[in-house]
């Protein structure tokens, strides 16, 4: 288990409990198992207390936790008959974006998401979930397929942001993001989105301009990273805590501002501690959101989506 900076006291406690268990297994103490169990109870209590008082910066750390379930984990657990589509038919394939045809609870659909990878090799292969223009154009291609065959679209967002490299900019990164966002607003089928980790900038919006948007309890969604914001506003990346607070990037803040529609509860300690439980909760939320849109006519779906985003910000402005 990888522990975050603020979880260090918890790591010490759980480490001591494991040491006692190791000694008990060797037969070096009769009551060590009881002592270990007592430490476990203290650790559980500490874990609950820590996650009850997460500030925006700590939530950012949790959202980035390397052991949180990623897009591929959700697809493998929640979807059947997944058939991936590759390439944008213009330049090439982008492994930061995965997507294809599938079935969700026996209903045919199209699923699209950012994939970060889960170890050094796969993270490099998937470019840490930072999509290039080809990824957004692949998503457009998939949304066109969904629109043609009247299939709902489900997107899973988990990206620090679109890739800012020279090659990506030369191939039209901003145009690709804009076209993907435009396509989200144009398709006449249900579109639901879940932010499962990081929802960074236009790279996230390009997949999440949806009829219904949900966020996991400890995920984040913002126009820029806290570090980037701090560097621009205060010329000091170390002010990321203040920036995280100012950005209103938590699911709780965004629900109040009516940017998102629902918050999906995570297991105590975050999705990384009980991935199967978190994945099941996301599946239930997707089913509920699709149920809300069932029976709506194509024109109603488009109107619903556009009005949702045109009205965005009215809550904050009063």
Curated annotation (Swiss-Prot):
It is found in: Cytoplasm. HAMAP family: AcetylCoA_CT_alpha. Acetyl-CoA carboxylase is a heterohexamer composed of biotin carboxyl carrier protein (AccB), biotin carboxylase (AccC) and two subunits each of ACCase subunit alpha (AccA) and ACCase subunit beta (AccD). Keywords: ATP-binding, Cytoplasm, Fatty acid biosynthesis, Fatty acid metabolism, Lipid biosynthesis, Lipid metabolism, Nucleotide-binding, Transferase. One of its GO terms (biological process) is fatty acid biosynthetic process. It catalyses: N(6)-carboxybiotinyl-L-lysyl-[protein] + acetyl-CoA = N(6)-biotinyl-L-lysyl-[protein] + malonyl-CoA. Belongs to the AccA family. GO terms for cellular component: acetyl-CoA carboxylase complex. It comes from the Bacteria. Residues 38-292 form the CoA carboxyltransferase C-terminal domain. Gene3D superfamilies: 2-enoyl-CoA Hydratase, Chain A, domain 1 (3.90.226.10). One of its GO terms (molecular function) is ATP binding. The lineage of its organism: Bacteria, Pseudomonadati, Pseudomonadota, Alphaproteobacteria, Rhodobacterales. Pfam families: ACCA. Its main location: cytoplasm. The keyword DNA-binding does not apply. This is Acetyl-coenzyme A carboxylase carboxyl transferase subunit alpha. It is an enzyme of class 2 (transferase). Component of the acetyl coenzyme A carboxylase (ACC) complex. First, biotin carboxylase catalyzes the carboxylation of biotin on its carrier protein (BCCP) and then the CO(2) group is transferred by the carboxyltransferase to acetyl-CoA to form malonyl-CoA. Coiled coil: none annotated. It comes from Paracoccus denitrificans (strain Pd 1222). Its EC number is 2.1.3.15. Pathway: Lipid metabolism; malonyl-CoA biosynthesis; malonyl-CoA from acetyl-CoA: step 1/1.
């Amino acid at each position: 288990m990888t522990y975050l900076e603020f979880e260090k006291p918890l790591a010490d406690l759980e480490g001591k409990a494991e040491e006692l268990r190791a000694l008990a297994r060797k037969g070096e103490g009769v009551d060590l198992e009881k002592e270990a169990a007592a430490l476990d109870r203290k650790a559980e209590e500490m874990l609950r207390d820590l996650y009850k008082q997460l500030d925006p910066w700590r939530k950012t750390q949790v959202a980035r936790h390397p052991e949180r379930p990623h897009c591929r984990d959700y697809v493998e657990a929640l979807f059947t008959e997944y058939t991936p589509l590759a390439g944008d038919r213009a330049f090439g394939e982008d492994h930061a974006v995965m997507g294809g045809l599938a079935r969700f609870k026996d209903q045919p659909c199209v699923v699209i998401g950012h994939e970060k990878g889960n170890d050094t090799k796969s993270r490099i292969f998937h470019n840490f979930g930072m999509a290039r223009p080809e990824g957004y154009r692949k998503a457009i291609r998939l949304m066109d397929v969904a629109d043609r065959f009247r299939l709902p679209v489900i997107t899973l967002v988990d990206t620090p942001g679109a890739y800012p490299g020279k090659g990506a900019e030369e191939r039209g990164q901003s145009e690709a993001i804009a076209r993907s966002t435009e396509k989200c607003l144009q398709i006449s089928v249900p579109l639901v989105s879940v932010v499962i980790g990081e929802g960074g900038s236009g790279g996230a919006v390009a997949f999440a301009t949806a009829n219904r948007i949900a966020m996991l309890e400890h995920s984040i969604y913002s126009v820029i990273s806290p570090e980037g914001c701090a560097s621009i506003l205060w010329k000091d990346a170390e002010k990321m805590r203040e920036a995280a607070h100012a950005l209103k990037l938590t699911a709780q803040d965004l629900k109040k501002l009516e940017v998102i529609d629902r918050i999906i509860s995570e297991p105590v300690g975050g999705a990384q501690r009980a991935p199967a439980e978190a994945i099941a909760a996301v599946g239930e939320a997707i089913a509920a959101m699709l149920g809300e849109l069932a029976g709506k006519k194509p024109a109603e779906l488009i109107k619903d989506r556009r009005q949702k985003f045109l009205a965005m910000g009215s809550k904050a402005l009063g």
